[in-house]
A protein has these predicted regions:
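Cytosolic, long alpha-helical scaffolding segments
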Residues: 1-229
Length: 229
């Protein structure tokens, strides 16, 4: 085996490691969202605190993936699609780390809400969380499989969670107007809804970057998601 062939195999192995690490981090972040919402719905402070404690694992993985990306850039000087893949990996981990932080924020609000009587049945927020988690999962699947169509589907679904947020906002405003003693609880629920909306935004960011990685075209800041690229 000559040196070039050995180097190419090592490079391919590092690219594979990068993909696996990003998937692992994405799976952990998805679990963090799931546990945060369970802590809210089940009024389980212990689950919320355990989720907050696990955030350091997400942060550590963020650093590890950054190191892999920077090593690939420095040692192999990739070009074209590989360069886009590695720089996208750097950006994806930033979004995943922020989603992890948002899961912590949800837990903090849930612990506060758990100290008071439940304001309303939890129907809207678990549904929003399910949409956000699905968007995140699909964006990571699109990354691994270089699936542009799936990435575009994620971008389109961002409107769904925006509509659910607006619907919940109107309902909670009615609660606050009719019963001022509910204001604090309603505001905390609104915060959680906005957190979930931000998770969906981060999933959309990931999906947009995948389109750029595969096609070399940016769809960011377009008024409408294109039917194809």
């Amino acid at each position: 085996m000559d040196v070039r062939q050995h180097t190419d195999r090592h490079y391919d192995a590092e690219l594979k490691e990068l993909n696996l690490k990003i998937l692992e981090m994405g799976g952990l972040v998805e679990k963090q969202i799931e546990h945060a919402i369970s802590g809210l719905v089940d009024r389980n402070d212990e689950m919320c605190r355990a989720t907050i404690e696990r955030d350091h694992v997400v942060n550590r993985m963020d650093v590890e993936i950054d190191d892999i990306c920077l090593r690939l850039l420095a040692l192999h000087q990739p070009a074209a699609k590989d360069l886009r893949l590695i720089t996208t990996g750097l950006k994806i981990t930033t979004d995943l780390e922020r989603i992890g932080d948002i899961a912590v924020n949800v837990c903090e609000r849930a612990i506060e809400l758990n100290q008071e009587p439940q304001l309303k049945p939890f129907i809207d927020i678990p549904r929003m969380a399910d949409v956000a988690q699905t968007m995140l999962r699909q964006s990571l699947d699109a990354f691994v499989n270089e699936n542009v169509e799936l990435a575009l589907t994620v971008c389109r679904n961002d409107d769904v969670i925006d509509q659910l947020t607006d619907q919940l906002f109107r309902e909670l405003i009615s609660y606050m107007v009719e019963a001022p003693q509910t204001i604090t609880r309603a505001i905390r629920l609104l915060f959680i809804a906005k957190y979930l909306e931000r998770i969906a935004d981060h999933a959309t960011n990931i999906a947009e970057m995948i389109v750029f990685t595969v096609k070399g075209k940016s769809i960011r800041h377009l008024d409408q998601v294109p039917g194809s690229v």
